[in-house]
Amino acid sequence: MERLRSSTRVLALLVALGVAGCAPASEIGSAEPPGRQSSKSALRPAGVLAAGSIASNEEPTRDTGARTPSLGSVREDEPYRGLGTWIDIYDHEVWQHPTRSVRSMAAHGIRTIYLQTSNYNRNQPFVHREGVEAILDAAQERGLEVVAWYLPGFADVATDLHRTLRSILLRTKAGNGFDSFALDIESPEVRRPVVRTRRLLRLSEAIRRRAGAEYPLGAIVASPHRLVRTDPYFWPGFPWRRLADLYDVMLPMTYYTYRVRGPQDAAWYTAQNVQIIRKETSGMKVPIHVVGGISFDATGPETQGFVRTVENKHVIGASYYTYPGITLDQWKALRTLR
């Protein structure tokens, strides 16, 4: 997901830091398919996150006593619906002016901010801790959702899990936290695909177990077109169906600017990624949120082609990677996805 260049919801989390008895240590408007939640719940024990559940020699997470809201009226894929935008750890202008950036996002009709916390080769769970908290507070004031995302390397699953849970548990002084968490699944740090898959699933199962059955989780997957057609040796045996069971939404990296040029080809590439996920998860009807871009390289007409396909394919949401590169022409096209 990273560029190739130098009172918020806490669903199903019975969180009380320091409380005893914690658990052990590249389709807009469609409805969630009937029975999906009940079948998942049967497979996932409800988890309880607490400070003792993650070994930590890093900065402790605050407990503000924020209220856990009722779960009955909240959909698992809700944070992923509609128009979103992405911030990674290299978007320095956002980190320097977080509140102003959120204000601008809201003015452009953004519903959800996808915010990177860290990655596997950093030595802390939050690269920009103050900026993360400022964005969470500003987003809460403007009614925007915020989804945390993290890039694991799978070489150290314990660290990847620890950092994921730190994101889920994070609270600002005002009591605000992330609305969901999404795992960025693309790193080839572990060279053997079979080992990489085993560790991905071990990490994903641990995240689901700790977060609980109702907490919304997203799987950010490398371009399905690449995984299945143009570079099948990159990750043979990619576990599409198991991921669709563990996560509530799939977010394919549909970076057509790496592969094609022009609005028609951008539309074609976007359609391919959606169709491949639906084929690989046949019968599961997994919700899809398409991540387009790269914004720094895309044109206005290409963005229109992307949007046209997103609307035609009935995904639950779409976004562009990343926010600072989105031009006025791109915004004009993207606004129709609100």
Predicted regions located by residue number:
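C-terminal motif of bacterial Sec signal peptides marking the signal peptidase cleavage site
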Residues: A20-G21
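Boundary/entry segment of secreted carbohydrate-active catalytic domains
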Residues: G52-I54, E59-H108, P152, I294-S295
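Aromatic-lined carbohydrate-recognition surfaces of secreted/lumenal glycan-active proteins
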Residues: T85-Y90, E145-V157, L200-G237, M284-D297
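Short, acidic/polar
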Residues: Y90-A107, A158-A174, D231-L243, T299-T309
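Active-site groove signature of glycoside hydrolases
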Residues: Y114-N121, S167-T197, S319
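Aromatic- and acid-rich polysaccharide-binding/catalytic face
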Residues: L115, F178-E189, W235-W268, Y321-I326
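Aromatic-lined substrate-binding rim segments of carbohydrate-active enzymes
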Residues: L115-L151, R191-A219
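Substrate-binding cleft of secreted/luminal carbohydrate-active enzymes
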Residues: Y247, P252-P263, E280-R338
